[in-house]
Amino acid sequence: VVNGGLVGVVDEVYDDYARVLLLTSPRCRVGARVLRADSRAVGVAGGVSGKDKLLLEHIYREASLREGDIIVTSGYSGSHPADILIGKVTATHMDSVGLLQEADIVPAADIADVEQVLVIVGFTPEAKIVLQGGQAK
């Protein structure tokens, strides 16, 4: 993480260093959501081969998504904290089969200018207490 937003995810850890998979890599996938009160749009953000942009995929057709929306990590997978800035939607369109929405995203962090990053370690998703009757608190 840099002050501009998410740069990538730790891919491999060694004794003295860690290898980071950049967010712009086609191999990188992060749970994401729209940061707008009237939108419940969620999807998966990741890199596009040969481009410096991101693609937000797997968004329900009915979800509210528009150009200019701010995209943040969703935190739903439990592998990343929620609400880390990813980027901004520059265009929306339907997927190749016309069933789901997709969005082009410009990354918030200028990865070409990154010199130092903050690595979040020891992240543990909030535990839920299961009450009698199966409801989580």
Please report, for each region that a protein language model flagged, where it lies by residue.
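A secondary-structure micro-motif
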Residues: V1-K137
